[in-house]
């Protein structure tokens, strides 16, 4: 999770929503993908950290199934990312801060408990949640400050 948090800080510095994700090979305890949100730079709403990490991992192992892999994410996944986690069959999901607005693991929809979900990873939440949450709060505080200063001019 520390590596995911490092990625989130990189996103923060790039004015991206500070979410980081890593995919780990469970058997060898090795990170095979380490990324962060990149929606602003790519001008593409699909470039969430989880989607990029899953894509990189699948390309690396030449398989769409990540049964022997775990994903660590600094923020509770949204609907798109939760579906990608299910479709790629990741074994375990570890995430940091809850997302009361868009999170669908435990905060809202509870996607992995729905009949629409055909694969449910083991779920572990609250890992480095305070660090992840503070980074998100600082990011959106900065955004609000920029918006306020533009309104004044």
UniProtKB/Swiss-Prot annotation:
User: Which InterPro entries does the record cross-reference, listed alphabetically?
Assistant: APOBEC/CMP_deaminase_Zn-bd, CMP_dCMP_dom, Cytidine_deaminase-like, tRNA_aden_deaminase
- CMP/dCMP-type deaminase domain residues are 1-116
Q: What is this protein called?
A: tRNA-specific adenosine deaminase
Which family does the similarity line name? Answer: Belongs to the cytidine and deoxycytidylate deaminase family.
What organism does the record attribute this protein to? Rickettsia conorii (strain ATCC VR-613 / Malish 7)
Instruction: Name the UniProt key words of this record, in alphabetical order.
Output: Hydrolase, Metal-binding, tRNA processing, Zinc
Cofactor: how bound: Binds 1 zinc ion per subunit.
Q: How does it assemble?
A: Homodimer.
Q: Which cofactor does it need?
A: Zn(2+)
Highest taxon of the source?
Bacteria
Q: Which GO terms describe its biological process?
A: tRNA wobble adenosine to inosine editing
What Gene3D superfamilies does the record tag this protein with?
Cytidine Deaminase, domain 2 (3.40.140.10)
């Amino acid at each position: 999770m520390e590596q995911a948090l490092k990625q989130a800080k990189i996103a923060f510095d790039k004015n991206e929503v500070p979410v980081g994700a890593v995919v780990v090979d469970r058997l060898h305890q090795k990170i095979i993908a380490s990324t962060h949100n990149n929606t602003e730079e790519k001008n593409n709403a699909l470039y969430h950290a989880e989607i990029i990490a899953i894509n990189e991992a699948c390309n690396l192992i030449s398989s769409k199934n990540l049964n022997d892999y775990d994903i660590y994410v600094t923020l509770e996944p949204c609907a798109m990312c939760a579906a990608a986690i299910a479709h790629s069959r990741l074994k375990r999901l570890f995430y940091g801060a809850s997302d009361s607005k868009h999170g669908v693991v435990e905060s809202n929809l509870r996607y992995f408990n729905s009949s629409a979900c055909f694969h449910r990873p083991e779920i572990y939440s609250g890992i480095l949640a305070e660090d992840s949450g503070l980074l998100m709060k600082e990011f959106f505080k900065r955004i609000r400050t920029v918006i306020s200063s533009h309104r004044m001019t």
